[in-house]
Each structure stands twice: as C-alpha cells, then as structure tokens.
Amino acid sequence: MKIGVPKEIKPQENRIGLTPDSVKVLTSNGNEVLVEKNGGLEAGFDNEQYKNAGAKLVDKAEDIFNDSEIIVKVKEPLSNEVKMIKENQIVFTYLHLAAAKELTQGLIDSKGVCIAYETVTDNNGRL
C-alpha cells in the first residue's frame, strides 16, 4: 500500500499522523510511505528521521493526496484537503462529524472511505 502523511494545517495542531517509528514498521512490511517535508518538525521529528525510517519526502500535500491509497492525519481535513480526497481513497483521522455538517457532506461527496479514530473500537466495544 502507498500511505501518505500530509502536514497538519489546522491552526494550533502540531502533531503528525505517523511517527518515524511507525513509518519504519510500515515500510519494513512492504508499504511505501510518503511524508510531507517538514511535516513532523513541530512534533519533534525532522526530515532525516523520516528518511532513515524509509519514508519518501514529498514537497506538497497535493502530491501526497494524488499518489496515496491511504491518508493518515491527526485532525479533520479542512475544506481544501477535502477537495483532494479521491474516490475510494482511505482517510484515517479524527473527524468529529457530529458538529460538522459541511465537512460531512464534503466527505460523502468525495466518495472516499473515511474512518474516524473516535469511532474505532475493539471486539469489546472499547475505544
């Protein structure tokens, strides 16, 4: 699978969807991981750490959305990101859809497969 990790663009959001350690696990299992350049800086991870973990650094979020089968984020996609989601592309992130009618409709219209972290449970119903 080709997994993309764009830089978070929501104000005050400094986290990133995958750490270098997570990238290493994914790449060692045969996945290709694309990480937006400087995407992890505010979370304490530099580009070299991602490269050493096996990630390919990409200049623009648009290229990550265009080239990835799976997108891994932290926060809900903003409107310009929603427009980049492709049909059948899998998006893992917090979505908080209950209070976001416009976001909900945009995701429906994208025909992507959007999985909200806050709704994922184990076999016992635990988050």
Where are these regions (language model features)?
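N-terminal beta-loop-helix "entrance" segment that forms/cooperates
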Residues: 34-57
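Glycine/serine-rich phosphate-binding loop and adjoining beta1-alpha1 elements at the start
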Residues: 2, 8, 79-127
